[in-house]
Swiss-Prot record:
Residues 18-85 are annotated as: Sigma-70 factor domain-2. This is ECF RNA polymerase sigma factor SigL. NCBIfam families: PRK09645.1, sigma70-ECF. It comes from Mycobacterium tuberculosis (strain ATCC 25618 / H37Rv). Belongs to the sigma-70 factor family. ECF subfamily. Interacts transiently with the RNA polymerase catalytic core formed by RpoA, RpoB, RpoC and RpoZ (2 alpha, 1 beta, 1 beta' and 1 omega subunit) to form the RNA polymerase holoenzyme that can initiate transcription. Interacts (via sigma-70 factor domain-4) with anti-sigma-L factor RslA. A motif (Interaction with polymerase core subunit RpoC) lies at residues 42-45.
Length: 177
């Protein structure tokens, strides 16, 4: 009997550590995607419940638990947005009063924009400036260099490191594509 309670205590300690380490950042992520604090809390609780149901993921040292948690949370939010219940509650209506339905691609695109905006906000001001000018405005390296008053080589270097930092940030948020 002591063996079971010891295993249960170890499992409870593992879940507490998982909660302490990831719940706050997971909640902020879910809040950013949902725009609703209560729904974000529900997403966090359900995500941590799924983590508890899959202890092999938490114990896997090759793959960080945070990436798995963010992926689960994101998928739950996508599933909720795609559901008929969400479309009937939140969706707008056309002239006949029939709810307009978002396509899965529209939902994914909106969530991707939120994720990228969140990741961009975490970059340094210098990296964000070159990313915005290059990828969002379509400026050349020379135009960026002139606008920022830096050498073209510096622009290229900052772009390289900015894209690398953006990729790492998105991976931490659970983006795998």
């Amino acid at each position: 009997m002591a063996r079971v309670s010891g295993a249960a205590a170890a499992e409870a300690a593992l879940m507490r550590a998982l909660y302490d380490e990831h719940a706050a950042v997971l909640w902020r992520y879910a809040l950013r995607l949902t725009g609703d604090a209560a729904q974000a809390e529900d997403v966090v609780q359900e995500t941590l419940l799924r983590a508890w149901q899959h202890p092999e993921v938490i114990g896997d040292t090759a793959r960080p638990a945070r990436a798995w948690l963010f992926t689960v949370a994101r998928n739950m939010i996508i599933d909720e947005r795609r559901s008929a219940r969400f479309r009937n509650v939140v969706g707008s209506t056309d002239q006949s009063g029939t709810p307009e339905q978002s396509t899965p691609d529209e939902v994914n695109a909106a969530l991707d924009r939120l994720l990228i905006a969140d990741a961009l906000a975490q970059l340094s001001a210098e990296h964000r400036a070159v990313i915005q000018r290059s990828y969002y405005r379509g400026w050349s390296t020379a135009q960026i260099a002139t606008d920022l008053g830096i050498a073209e080589g510096t622009v290229k270097s900052r772009l390289h490191y900015a894209v690398r930092a953006l990729r790492l940030t998105l991976q931490e948020l659970g983006v795998t594509r």
